[in-house]
Every structure is written in structure tokens, then in C-alpha cells.
């Protein structure tokens, strides 16, 4: 039986953690033995990631932290190239145990979902972890990355494992401020939305005068009325737009509409569930079978 290890090196509030966990669950449901290996960001604990998953989903399973030794023929899957480049860029912050796990997972067969977070660093990261080109397979959402490489692949949310959303409105407008860049852009607009909540981490750049919702947030999708979309930089797969569509919530598109990325693409795409869209990940399943 093929074993797939999905590697996540992001923060607990990052969308790639959620896509990674959702695909882990779906592949297991299809009979493919899959684990999610989380190599923690130094600012966060196991419990931070556990809470992030438990707040969103009906189950917590097949998740391993930091210490894992794959079999020689296992397949590693990353849901975005940044999961590899972050491991390279943050390498000196990891424990020896984490470094060993990363080298073990990033030394063999790799299925890599194309992204452009760290274009220059990606080939350097591949070399750092001693990947051989013939063992690296690319998948890509070509609507988002028109010049990307790889067979077509679209990241789709697995709504089938979501906890029921309880309607309990606490703020009218939700903003995303989970890093310094996002937060700076939110600050440009927030004065026009007095009844707001900013999804954020407790970090030194936040404005204490604002109303914050610190990650993880219980029943996040049930506590706001409207999402205000302000991300100023490239956004490949904005989950919350799809989540709002799924729930029938309003979204205010408050960013430069000339930005060509996943924002306008996911704005137009209908909300759908991964379990109903197996054809959309056919290339992933095909490569798992072939490698």
C-alpha cells in the first residue's frame, strides 16, 4: 500500500494547514494511508495546531508532530511550495529532531503543489534537502498561475468534515490580520468599519485600540456577518471567500482588482466540497499511484 506524508511547516492559522489536513482526511477515506506531519513554527506549540484543527473539524486523526521517520518508498506531498521553502528559510530555528524529520521527508519522492511565495529560494531549498529532479512531481492551478508548471490541480475545501457553524454574530465585519503585511493594510480601512473584528496573532505589531479575534477562534465562521477582503499581496487560494459562499455570507472585495491571483479566481468559483470533486484532484491520485 502506498503511504503519503503531507508535510506542513506553516503557522496554525495558515490556510495551508487546513488544506493539508483536509486532503489527509480525504486520501485516507479513499483508502490511501496518509499522515499529516507538522513541523512546528518556533513561535507555536503542538496545542496551538491541535486547537486550530479541533476548532474547525469534527475529527482529529493521523497527525504527527516534529518526530517522524518515513519508509524509504513513502511519498511526500506539500500543498504549496512554501512548505519546503519555509523549512529551508527557518532551518536554523528547528531542533535537531525537527531537522532530521525534514531531511527524512524531503529526501525522496515529492509531489509539490506550485506556488510563488519564494521563487528564488525554491530551487535552493530543493538542493538543500538533496532532492533529485526525477523524483519531484509538480501540480499547479493554472487559472491562478498562468505561467506555473505541472499538471492541473485545484485546492478545494473538504467541507464534509467541518463542524456545524453556529450563528452567533459578535462583530459585523471580519478582517484578516494574521501577519504584519495583512495587518498594515487592514489599518488603512478599519476606521470605516467600527463594528469590526481582526483575526490575528498576539504579536508586537498589532494596535491595541482595535478589536481582535486571536487565533484559534471558536466557531469563527459563525461570529461575523461580512468578511472584508483586503489582502494586498499575492493570494493563491483564499479559503474564506469560499467558506463565505458556502454559508451565504457577504464578502466585501476591498483590494486592488488589478491584482491577478487567486482572489478574482476564487471570487468567481462556486463553493464546492472536495468529496464531491474527485475529478479535480485526479492528477494527484494518478501521481500517487505512479510514484
Placement of each model-derived feature along the sequence:
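N-terminal pre-catalytic "stem/leader" segment of glycosyltransferase-like enzymes
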Residues: 1-94, 118-124, 252-291
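Hydrophobic anchor at the start of a short beta-strand
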Residues: 4, 33-35, 108-111, 194-198, ...
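A conserved mid-protein helix/loop that constitutes part of the nucleotide-sugar donor-binding site
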Residues: 18-22, 178-192, 201
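Catalytic core of nucleotide-activated saccharide and alditol-phosphate transferases
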Residues: 76-188, 278
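Conserved active-site histidine-acidic residue motif and adjacent donor-binding/catalytic loop
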Residues: 160, 203-221, 236-237
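A short alpha->beta transition loop at the rim of the catalytic pocket in nucleotide-sugar-dependent
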Residues: 225, 248
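Nucleotide-sugar-dependent
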Residues: 229-241, 246, 256, 260-261
